[in-house]
Amino acid sequence: GQTEACGQVFHWSEGDTFVLPAGGEAIHSSDTHAGLYWVHDAPLLRYLGVSTVKPVFEPCFYSHQDARAQLDAIASNPRGANANRVSVLLGNNAFPQTRTVTHTLWAMLGILPAGQVQRPHRHQSIALDFAVACQPGCYTMIGTELDENGMIRNGHREDWAAGAAFVTPPGYWHSHHNESGADAYVLPIQDAGLHTYLRTLDIAFSNRGRADLSHTP
């Protein structure tokens, strides 16, 4: 497919990501049936009672093929064996401090290898998680408390489905599980750009074997 916006034309295929600034029109077209997962700032603007004045960044395109190549390289590196997450962070040169795709939104492409668990973590940004590819047996546990082993107590289970999205609420612990026989890929999009700017992200990770917390600086 392709998108015409801001005087540019973007040619895209399955898994590609692009961001467009406010204002102007975007015309999307495709020779075959296509679905776009669209996340935008309208709820925030509506809550504040404001409208956009000017664009604050240029359009940016992220190739899924390039991101997957980088992700595979990271996943095969032994240094990542003990990492809480294995992912490629999508960035924009306009936002070097927040390391986000827009001034408000953060995105990354992550892999959850077959048979692995991404241990509980939490943050004050809300996460809109898009399941890029997965098999039955992939799910997320969500809850407010940890047990003595640092896992979620009495959590809610949200099963993944390829092409579907789920929400992890702000401040809730969540862990990702892959009990299938195939690697899974997920694209979380968060309002972490806004929280990073306000210094309110407050991300924390559970420690293995105990319920106290490890905070990032």
Can you say where each PLM-predicted feature lies in the sequence?
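Conserved hydrophobic/aromatic positions in well-ordered beta-strands
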Residues: 37, 108-110, 129, 187
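Short amphipathic alpha-helical linker/capping segments at the junctions of internal repeats
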Residues: 15-18, 145-150, 155-157, 165, ...
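Conserved metal-binding segment of the jelly-roll/cupin
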Residues: 11-32, 39-42, 158-180, 186-191
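A short beta-strand-loop-beta hairpin characteristic of the jelly-roll/cupin
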Residues: 1-14, 131-162
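Double-stranded beta-helix
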Residues: 31-80, 177-217
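A short glycine-rich, His/Asp/Glu-containing loop-to-beta-strand
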Residues: 82-127
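Extended hydrophobic-aromatic, low-complexity segments
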Residues: 121, 138-141, 150-151, 176, ...
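Active-site proximal loops enriched in glycine and acidic residues that flank catalytic Cys/His/Asp
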Residues: 124, 132, 142-144, 169-172, ...
